A protein has these predicted regions:
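Loop-to-transmembrane-helix transition segments
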Residues: 9-17, 65-92, 136, 159-169, ...
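Glycine-/small-residue-enriched transmembrane alpha-helix faces in small-molecule transporters
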Residues: 1-44, 83, 154-181, 202
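Specific alpha-helical transmembrane segments that line the substrate/conduction pathway
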Residues: 41-52, 90-130, 168
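Membrane-interface helix termini and inter-helical loops of multi-pass transporters
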Residues: 29-35, 66, 147-158, 207-221
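Conserved small/polar residues in nucleotide/adenosyl-binding loops
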Residues: 236-239
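Transmembrane alpha-helices of multi-pass small-molecule transport proteins
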Residues: 35-88, 115-119, 138, 171-178, ...
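Loop-to-transmembrane alpha-helix entry segments
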Residues: 106-109, 122-145, 155-162, 214-221
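A helix-boundary/kink motif common to multi-pass secondary transporters
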Residues: 36-38, 101, 187-188
């Protein structure tokens, strides 16, 4: 039996990640609409719980964790990643869902493909490849269709939904760029343990989620922990 190449494994991980992210968005929409959960509450508690799980997992990498904790410069880098990368990314995603729906938020997020393609071409000082041009065109078509429902002269999405969707796309680029060096150096588990806790605690101090706790039943808690375990811990862990 042939072993999977790194490229093939990457394709499968990307596809599986997309499916899990989509299901996480649907679960988030379920909590936001049915239980009237706040995007602030959902993001803060989600990140804090996921950070605790990552912290437990990182105990197997005590050397890396100990080195990071003892070096303020490394910690500051991960703190910035946790707040301006992870927290902004997840908060804008749930706000985008709350003002539209999970499908719309995901389609708007594809604009990050356009932004990343432009940044890569500028960084390497080259023209875009054919596949990159095709990706940009498809992303634009998808956003135009979801925003207008095919009626080009009309904007179906509310301004808030569009703004949060665009902010979500920008945050995806920021999150990706901020994560490259620390994850490569320390591993995704250690970096996300500190980053998730940083973003979750920071947002919790600002918003105080314990004061706006939604009344969740069994289905609500299953959806929430599904988001934490599958849509966060599994999704943010590199194989």
């Amino acid at each position: 039996m042939k072993t999977l190449t790194n490229t093939t494994r990457g394709y499968w991980c990307a596809a599986l990640g997309g499916v899990i992210w989509g299901l996480s968005g649907v679960a988030g929409q379920f909590l936001l609409s049915v239980y009237d959960a706040s995007p602030f509450w959902l993001t803060g508690v989600r990140m804090t719980c996921a950070g605790i799980v990552f912290l437990i997992l990182s105990l197997r990498q005590t050397r890396s964790l100990g080195i990071v904790v003892r070096h303020p410069k490394e910690l500051i880098t991960i703190f910035v990643y946790g707040i301006f990368g992870l927290m902004l990314n997840q908060l804008s995603y749930f706000f985008s869902i709350s003002y539209s729906n999970a499908g719309t938020a995901t389609v708007l997020q594809t604009l990050c493909v356009v932004m990343m393609a432009v940044l890569v071409c500028l960084q390497r000082r080259r023209l875009p490849y054919t596949r990159e041009v095709l990706s940009v065109i498809l992303a634009f078509i998808g956003v135009v269709l979801i925003a207008t429902h095919g009626r080009i002269t009309e904007l179906v999405l509310s301004p808030r939904a569009l703004i949060w969707g665009l902010l979500y796309a920008v945050s995806c680029v920021v999150y990706t760029l901020l994560s490259i060096k620390p994850v490569h150096k320390w591993g995704s588990v250690v970096v996300n343990a500190i980053g998730m806790l940083t973003g979750g605690i920071f947002l919790s101090f600002l918003y105080r989620p314990w004061e706006v706790m939604p009344h969740l039943d069994l289905a609500g808690w299953l959806a929430f922990f599904g988001i934490v375990l599958f849509g966060t811990c599994l999704l943010y862990t590199s194989p």
